[in-house]
From Swiss-Prot:
Catalytic residues (UniProt): 115
Gene for this chain: ndk
The species this protein was found in: Chlorobium chlorochromatii (strain CaD3)
Catalysed reaction equations from the record: a 2'-deoxyribonucleoside 5'-diphosphate + ATP = a 2'-deoxyribonucleoside 5'-triphosphate + ADP; a ribonucleoside 5'-diphosphate + ATP = a ribonucleoside 5'-triphosphate + ADP
Protein name: Nucleoside diphosphate kinase
Cofactor(s) listed in the protein's UniProt record: Mg(2+)
SMART domains: NDK
HAMAP family reported in the protein's UniProt record: NDP_kinase
Amino acid sequence: MERTLTILKPDCVRKQLIGAVINHIERAGFRVVAMKKIHLTKEAAGEFYAVHRERPFYGELVDFMSSGACVPMILEKENAVADFRTVIGATDPAEAAEGTVRKLYADSKGENIIHGSDSVENAAIEAAFFFSTEEVVRSN
């Protein structure tokens, strides 16, 4: 069984869409094996998104991700990483397929509701950033 990491971003929390988005994710066959609600500091957001440090949007991304509470989750499913990227849709909601999380709920490319790991390797690294092994529930 494969795992991926997602983060319901501050815009999702502010718009009170946590339940709707989790429902969408679970209906797509994913099992939530870890979840918490946190408020990232700028330092933590910068560390998490360090891979984008040289990109022009890095500062705005760090500011946004530290602007309010977010909900990181570890999800489990066969082919989790690729399937989840399909479920959430393109980064820009204007380009996202109908019925995807971003098409349904996101307002812009910068505030796009949700993060999804882009590879199995990054999913493991990102999951370890937010969760200890004790916080991850083994699926039955």
